[in-house]
């Protein structure tokens, strides 16, 4: 029952984020959805996705608080470097993981600067890692795979239709 509840919570968070892509300002929706996805990641003990949601929430808060473009650029880069270092120290580095961490940085930077090409790269990298993680047995990762596939498609639409 709890497993189903947290899976549904994750999918609901995904819907909140996707709805947020149609709203101005969108960052409140992104944070609300990220909180729900964070709860799902914590329940399933998915370290990568816990870090992803915390890094993205920090980026959205930096935008909301108008901390400045340099902080909005360097905050996700520094946090992703820490995450990469953590995995390196514990000997857990794999190419798909590196791709996922780069995806977090690109997604956060793409959001901060409203750059759809960077956003597309980030969401594609995270989706790729998530499909890989789901295939390797972390089935809740498919929630993030679905979300980031949809975000990549939205970015493609915005690139070619606007």
Regions found by a protein language model. Give the residues of each.
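Alpha-helical membrane-protein topology signature
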Residues: 1-162
